[in-house]
């Protein structure tokens, strides 16, 4: 479903779905129930859309390993990341902060890309990225003065 003119999340979607490619569309938001029942979904590609908010729509995605929300208009990081998540791509958005201990619920997280956002030191707590599993953390092109 990538490279279309979709303006909203399609549905209902097959519960057996493992990968969902909705990149390069014009989707502006992900309603809380849009991904309900997709417990087998391992990869969700939503990059290059107009998404401003995802709310808690990711909470039920128990098998999700990869989430790509890069090149959107997000100001906040998604609520309730799935515990199986390994790759989170949020570069080229307008994210200005990451909550304290935000990644604690995702112990398998290996890659976090937050480059080209609006992050400042006030928006990052000192323990935000304290994770022993993290292999790559990209915070380039923000307004950070120290880490």
UniProtKB/Swiss-Prot annotation:
LRR repeats: 1-15, 16-37, 40-61, 63-84, 85-105, 108-128, 133-147
Subunit structure: Binds to type I and type II collagen.
Organism: Sus scrofa
Secreted among keywords: yes
Post-translational modification, as annotated: Binds keratan sulfate chains.
Organism taxonomic ancestry: Eukaryota, Metazoa, Chordata, Craniata, Vertebrata
Name listed for the protein in its UniProt record: Fibromodulin
Note: Incorrect gene name (LUM) has been attributed by Ref.1. LUM and FMOD are two different genes but members of the same family.
Entries under Pfam families matching the protein: LRR_8 (PF13855)
């Amino acid at each position: 479903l990538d490279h279309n003119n979709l303006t909203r999340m399609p549905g209902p979607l097959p519960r057996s779905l493992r990968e969902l490619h909705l990149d390069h569309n014009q989707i502006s938001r992900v309603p809380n129930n849009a991904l309900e029942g997709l417990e087998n979904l391992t990869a969700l590609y939503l990059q290059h859309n107009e998404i401003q908010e995802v709310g808690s729509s990711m909470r039920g995605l128990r098998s999700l390993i990869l989430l790509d929300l890069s090149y959107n208009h997000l100001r906040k990081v998604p609520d309730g990341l799935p515990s199986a998540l390994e790759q989170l791509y949020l570069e080229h958005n307008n994210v200005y902060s990451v909550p304290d201990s935000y990644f604690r619920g995702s112990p398998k997280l290996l890659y976090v890309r937050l480059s080209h956002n609006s992050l400042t030191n006030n928006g990052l707590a000192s323990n935000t990225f304290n994770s022993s599993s993290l292999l790559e953390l990209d915070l380039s092109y923000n307004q950070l003065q120290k880490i």
